[in-house]
């Protein structure tokens, strides 16, 4: 549900998956995508309860790639029709509401799929399990333009409302073993990867359910978004000095009208774990850069490929009957299992070097 950037990318990926027989894509208007043998498009207004229920009924699984504020409605219909539910939301309140629905469901409910939350949680929890005692788990993710000439050093590559939402809400974390919340845009740090300098700061949602899972088990756990240096200060100016945090609709409209959209982007993933065993203190890390590529004769951005691959891998695991009913956390899946999936391995494997185009031939 949702034929935006991620929805159409997921549909294109599922075309090559043996576990998927048919893909049904729904939105108000058909997107500009090639005709694919498995793909069936349906025009639906998601606020029309009757048509939404009719479309969902009888399907094996529903993926909501719709705006996060529609997910509660979609999840409720899935609960009613006993259809498995997955989504891409990073919104904490939406996830909490869906979790309540999942308590009385006999099918799988797995929100927060995709990149962050999503694959980053699978990676982080799997690294943490390699050490018997973990001091810290640091999750760092950024979707950045490869080239940027504006003052923000940023171009749009995904949903603007979701982006601004992450900059405005509180960030969950563990500090000295306790669950606390930090203010988005704070906790700024500098890091250098492959000779390029970046900044990272707290944003909302990316940690998913990891704080709940590891409270009392890991001393310090946090998630930060990676940007080019200087971006954070300009966002603080817009949100707090101009008080657009109380008028996010205006800020969203300004971004959509004036900030260019790019498909020439890079997704940066960096996870660092420090812990100890009987031999001493050890560090485990995962670093990956994902770039845009072509699929079905069309170019997809890095954020499209990384987000869609996160959910495609989860769907493959679900198709094998390996996900339980009710609410399922991302960290329920081990990285080794995720990297065995078709798209998990192609996009997220540290050794993946071939292009997406080569891999699907």
Q: Predicted regions: what is each one?
A:
Residues 67, 76-96:
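ADP-ribose/adenylate-binding Rossmann-like module
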Residues 56, 60-65, 85-87:
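N-terminal Rossmann-like NAD(P) cofactor-binding module of classical short-chain dehydrogenase/reductase
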Residues 45-59:
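Conserved Rossmann-fold cofactor-binding substructure of NAD(P)-dependent oxidoreductases
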Residues 6:
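Hydrophobic/small residue at the entry helix of a nucleotide-binding pocket
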Residues 1-2:
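Conserved N-terminal Rossmann-fold NAD(P)-binding element of oxidoreductases
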Residues 130-361:
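C-terminal catalytic/substrate-binding lobe primarily of soluble NAD(P)-dependent oxidoreductases
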Residues 19-35:
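NAD(P)-binding Rossmann-fold cofactor-contacting core
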Residues 88-111:
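Rossmann-fold NAD(P)-binding glycine/threonine-rich loop
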